């Protein structure tokens, strides 16, 4: 899931902050309950024909195509704004999060105007752009499962996610055939994109020569289970241990230091592949996730001060007041248009990994990072943005180390 943030700043006293947080939590809980109850599709998955499958030879089927203009080239305000390098050292195959919240379909059509608007104007500039220093970015559109698929572990929701994965796999195969040409690559993902990234890493990449070309996977925002790195499940990948680790999984799930996951209400599921080519959906609640602290790139539990945060970054909209927010989650565009990225907000939050495997942050200074918080103080929509500059630098670090290793 990914919601918009506008370029807003505020100065508040400690008392105002306290009451603002209490009010925010109440509004989040009530608003979330109202929002979620409206999302269930009116029919079951098998009762209607899915939207047409993508043709990945068509540029329009890509949110980011190597030969088409897009907003993955955005750089933070005040940073080097030169054009993307022509000689990129690696690629990133980026799988976007959920942007379809409707109840009309279990899987969004590829030409769904509002879902694509959210991807093109918020997700690509706000998330995929973190990789544009030295990486060529490709990002497919796919028949994503509607957001409701994660709210209940239903047969229809699982079927919708499996259909979405077939598109992601097809897009990856197209990328390999037409663009990769033996180059190293990253996997980048968030939320639903990470659900599919987990499966792609296990079923298509792990144990093959592709694993040797995988610099790292930034599989953020869907509780990548720690137990998938036990008993030989993954042959080629391990959880990241340092800033320069390669062929590894980098993951975190962000909460306010006053919040935390609500396992009792969480019905989202994770795919576990079986050795016979099949798999099983397993509820993720109470599973310890893989965890990396993006302010230190370690997986220990020491607190890391906000001074280590090199800059949180958010999308700046061309006309925030012109956005028709009442239409969010509907069928039509609501007037979103990304103008630029903000300047880095240095020292925005501190971060601490706790024993439960989740990342806990101090309350953000900038209002733009508090307008779309989810229940439990979940900063899911800011998993990338709060650590943007640290991520941007780290992608370059890992790539440089990988290329040095290959040159030996």
Give residue ranges: language-model regions.
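Basic, amphipathic N-terminal segments that precede the first structured/catalytic domain
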Residues: 12-82
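Proline/glycine-enriched tight loop/beta-turn segments at coil->beta junctions
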Residues: 85-90
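Surface cap/lid and interfacial helix-loop subdomains adjacent to catalytic sites
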Residues: 164-182, 202-369, 376-378, 382, ...
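Gly/Ala-rich beta-loop-alpha elbow adjacent to hydrolase catalytic centers
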Residues: 189-193, 197
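Active-site-proximal beta-strand/loop segments in catalytic clefts of secreted hydrolases
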Residues: 95-98, 141-145, 190-191, 220-223, ...
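Structural recognition of the beta-strand scaffold that forms the well-ordered cores
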Residues: 91-95, 138-141, 186-187, 216-219, ...
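Active-site catalytic motif of lipid deacylating hydrolases and related acyltransferases
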Residues: 33-58, 94-184, 347, 354-408
